[in-house]
Regions:
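Active-site capping/gating regions of soluble enzymes
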Residues: 1-126, 132-140
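Acidic, glycine-enriched catalytic cores built around paired aspartates
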Residues: 130-198
């Protein structure tokens, strides 16, 4: 959960009593920045091969995965990537426990501040259950299917290169490519069981 306060800690810049769902224009620009760069930030927020098994998990018997698989925001909607649970704050639901906590926070700031600086528009909120009805939403962007797709998006992102610095992005992408290559070069039990007789 996050909000943005002034230096005194007394004014929440994300709160506006007259704003939709109690959020300010600044908060919506921040959300839009996070949505804009979410796919490129996946390699940082979801840095392991197994992260993408969580993101793209099938719906459980409860009707949810508790992990978003598309790039969207909504009110008190646990099927969206960004949730607005109450006035003056947002919940970012994409990140997993494998993320470096410092890079995770830096990524939020890079993307959110880019949204504010460029007055990005998040579009209309989605109130549908995206697990059950996501196919009905036209133009809904999906999150990367695997770590390699995420790495490639990180590498191409101007927002991340500007925010983190080109040298960091190059080094990070090189490290993640090395990890992906190591994974791709290993033979899993599933492959042994299902493909060795091909």
């Amino acid at each position: 959960h996050g909000s943005m306060w002034d230096k005194t800690g007394k004014k929440n810049h994300f709160y506006d009593a007259k704003g939709e769902l109690g959020l300010s224009k600044m908060a919506y620009h921040f959300i839009a920045g996070v949505l804009h760069s979410a796919d490129a930030l996946c390699s940082i927020w979801n840095p392991s091969v197994n992260s993408y098994k969580r993101i793209n998990a099938p719906v459980t018997s409860s009707g949810a995965t508790w992990s978003p698989n598309s790039i969207a925001y909504g009110g008190n909607n646990r099927s969206t990537m960004v949730r607005i649970p109450d006035t003056g704050r947002v919940e970012l639901r994409l990140m997993d426990g494998a993320a470096n906590p410092y890079l995770l926070q830096a990524g939020i700031l890079v993307a959110g501040l880019d949204g504010i600086a460029n007055k990005r528009d998040p579009g209309k909120r989605i109130d549908l259950n995206l697990y059950a009805e996501g196919h009905k939403v036209k133009g809904l962007r999906k999150l990367p299917l695997n770590l390699l797709d995420a790495i490639r998006l990180t590498e191409k992102s101007k927002v991340l290169r500007d925010g983190f610095g080109d040298s960091f992005v190059k080094s990070y992408v090189k490290l993640k490519h090395s990890q992906w290559d190591d994974y791709a070069g290993s033979l899993s039990q599933w492959e042994r069981d299902n493909t060795l007789d091909c």
